[in-house]
Amino acid sequence: MGLTTHSLLSPEHLKVPYDRERLEDVGFMTCMTLVLLGNYAQTGHFGGPLAYTPYNVAAHLVGPELGGLRYDYRRPKHPYSDKFMLAGGHNAPTSYALWMIMGQALERQYKATGDPRYFVDPKVAILPIDALGFRRGAGALKNLLQNLSLDNHPLFAQAKARGIKALAGHIESTDVTNDVNGGPSGIGIATAAGKAAFWDFMGAPSSPKVIALEGEFALAEGHAQELKTQALAMQVGKRLRILLSDNNAGIDDVLIGGVIAAKYTAYRLVDQWTSYGWNVFTLDNGNDYDQIVSTLKAMEDWDPRDRRPMIAIGKTTKGYWPRAVEGKIPGYGPQLVSYPSHPYALKMNSDYFVALARTFEEHYGVEFSGIRQGPVADPRERLIQFKTNLDVVMSLLDRNGLGDWLADRLVALGDTVKDEVPLRFDVKIDPFLDGRLRVANLPVEPQKVTVANRLSGAEKQVAITLFRKPGEMAGTRRAVSEIIKWMNYVTDNRFITLAADLSESINVEHGSLWGHYDPEANPLGTRFKAAIQEAGNVSTAIGLVSQSASVDPNQFAGVWALSGTYGAFTPLMYTPARVWSQQNQDSRFRMGVLHILAGHSGPETAADGRTHFGIFATQVWKLFPRGQTIHLNFWDYNDVAPGYFAAAEIAARDPKVGIISLEVARPDFPVADRAQFADTDLKAAAKGLYVIRDFAAGQPRHGYVLAQGSSSTVNLVKQLPRLEAAGINVKVVSAISEELFDRQPEAYRQAVLPPEARYDLMVVSTGTRRVWPIRDVGPLTDAYSLTSDWDNQWLTSGLEADVIAEAHLDPESIFAGIQRFAQDHRQRLARQRDMLAALELPIYD
């Protein structure tokens, strides 16, 4: 299909009827509720949530036939619901407020009729009582009412069902329909392309779709900018629809006329998105329901053969108020708008708040309690006034059939979500639990397997080599494509890779059994083409793994994904991954596993220059709660498969493990002869730490040497005969993964590296002295270890051998370092004993 450069701008006037008055009422209630949240909590955001409200209300209530969301408030995390992303996370009050109103409407109708269609589990819903939890922690809320003698007060009876929910200052994916942790600006929206691509990959019909809300300042952020390329590269088409709130206002400045001087008239959002190939719609007034609904309808009716992603850019007012007239609040004066309205900075029951409330009172003939008597100092009385006035807003549900309409609307929308959707994969099975992926079942010999493309009917043979013979020249990176191939062979093409234009270089290119993904021409391809966009690539990977097509929340039916680049550049991926880890920790349903490949890591990346060294950079992958990620650092080809599949075996069964990071170096080395090791197990890496050389019996012991990294370990192994000849009796332990080691039986851990060994330990590593391979090393470990930052300086660059020597990780430096460590054995232990003895001496003032 031929596509024009420019798309439809400013959709035609809506000719299809919709319940505009109902939307406006719910919208005004939402605005008033979110202002009450800020007034009584005295924190939060103000102008942005108000600006988003018409978008939010329309998307949730007009229905899928008009381009709104298909979802079930009673089952908001149903996999086949459309995905709503409040990516501008600080605008959370608009969603909290709307969900409270919806939850109240359903609870009201259920109590009135007893009809189970209206029942929503209080643990799922957000209810008016949860307003008290706005920007509060769960611990503080547990006894809040009891501490103020309000636990039996009728105003707060709703809390008896399940307490008060904590509503975070920035929205999270656990919240009702929201499917993004909208924290750092631009980070959340960047995952939208991956979420949309997931449903294309799974072969879903036009729904589920993704509707994401964001603002112009956040879309200037780097991750969000990379989304432009990501979404077009994956050809997600109308499945992705962004609603942009363009009010030219940030936190403390305007964009045009502030950050960008007004004279640069060519800086136009519409042109920016159009130039990236997107299908762009514009709204003169993004706070007008007619224009919003007409745009949603135009998006819905668009030709699905057009694979351009969609964005609607609507001019909005930050600080929008439904009853404002020409920039003024009737009876008060100038409306608080633009960036000064960003935070909720109004004093409790301030004149401006009262003016807003008055317009609501006059419009609906209601009256708020106590707001004209100034701030409420007493905490108990504040909560009473807060809940009383919230109930004033909710009382509108009892008027003019509004509550009945809203409850019926939510039930009707919910009933459009079905438990069966035709998909390309069997969603009753989690392929990552297949026994062939267990370490014990990995084939040791090279495999030649026949794979069939069930869409095209094509067949071919694929060679997979998870293990190699001793002496073969193959570095750890060479094994990466093999583990991915085995994954895709076993899981029927459910392991996706996205690399920053480095797919071949970091050895993920050939992991795809059927080549490059294309939603139409090659939907079973698992290699997603990607630009040099580390942030965007990992965000897309997160979008992919954050979805599941299983109706059973405890059963996973989705994909795993890997994003990779040079180890030195992987910190660009950290913030999205951190936010993902938080989302995964609290998810109510099983999700996939994000993989980070730190390729070309360590000082071995010498020829490219020190800008490309992954020495300090890769250590960010340890900056997660313990047990929620597994980091793997490989030195030998035959460590990769057992180490990785041990991690995969855990992650597939432990929902807390949401990230596996792999660190490999560039050079090829001879595959190690494990017959010469103390631990001859070919799959020893699965245990995290394993013994290369044990203490020689009957001789004085000189300590433990922990080895990590490629050149460091290879060069250390080369020196073992020389060390033995010199009478140096050390135990050499390979450190692949502390996280895997932590999961081994106590007896194994004691045998390999008992706790006391940490006080008699040195490290030989291509990493740094800032982050050790294991925790709790002894006080003298740093003084004797060999690391790439031994002199606290950045290394220079040059040939690989030059830089390894500069890092003091060449064979001679390693021998000398271990020799010194061994010779000082008695002295080292004596110094530590003296330190402990000093603590036992009497201390006098």
For the regions a protein language model found, what residue spans apply to each?
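Thiamine diphosphate
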Residues: 133, 137-178, 187-191, 201-211, ...
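N-terminal leader/propeptide and maturation segments of large enzyme subunits in energy/redox metabolism
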Residues: 112-115, 119-121, 125, 349, ...
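Non-catalytic terminal/interface segments that mediate subunit docking, oligomerization
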Residues: 400-590, 677-712, 718-728, 773, ...
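N-terminal capping segment at the start of a domain
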Residues: 27-43, 245
